Curated annotation (Swiss-Prot):
Organism placement in taxonomy: Bacteria, Pseudomonadati, Pseudomonadota, Gammaproteobacteria, Enterobacterales
Protein's recorded name: Protein MioC
Role noted for this protein: Probable electron transporter required for biotin synthase activity.
Residue stretches making up the Flavodoxin-like domain: 4-143
Transmembrane segments: none
Family named by the database record: Belongs to the flavodoxin family. MioC subfamily.
Keywords, in A-Z order: Electron transport, Flavoprotein, FMN, Transport
């Protein structure tokens, strides 16, 4: 089993790029990783460390590829008390639902007993053409919280 499972939800691929970049950085730091783009809940171990990275679609909506995961969290209320997670949202401050998807995912993970490690990073694409840059900066401090 990987030390850290990266879970991405993306409409245009931005969150996938961030997940893949952070997986490389985590491996350079000595962690083993598994990156899953739009996994189903049953694809995941109910323990360990998850890093959830999601863009926001439409009016604060979960990306289509992560909707089944989110809906399963809501409906099944799994016991995720053995999961620690970090969260990164990607969105545009042009919308009043800025990073609404990661807010929803974070809430459902906590409702299922998962413990958040660190603060959620919310990346405004208007300020960062390359969302991998602020995500990598955040990752350094997040790694320290895992120790």
């Amino acid at each position: 089993m990987a030390d850290i499972t990266l879970i991405s939800g993306s409409t245009l691929g931005g969150a996938e790029y961030v997940a893949e970049h952070l997986a490389e950085k985590l491996e350079e730091a000595g962690f083993t990783t598994e990156t899953l783009h739009g996994p189903l809940l049953e694809d995941l171990s109910a323990s360990g460390i998850w890093l959830v990275i999601s863009s926001t679609h439409g009016a604060g909506d979960i990306p289509d590829n992560l909707s089944p995961f989110y809906e399963a969290l809501q409906e099944q209320k799994p016991d995720l008390s053995a999961v620690r997670f970090g969260a990164i949202g990607i969105g545009s401050r042009e919308y009043d639902t800025f990073c609404g998807a990661i807010d929803k995912l974070e809430a459902e993970l906590k409702n299922s007993g998962a413990k958040q490690t660190g603060e959620t990073l919310k990346i405004n694409i208007l300020d960062h053409d390359i969302p991998e840059d602020p995500a990598e900066e955040w990752l350094g401090s997040w790694i320290n919280l895992l120790k």
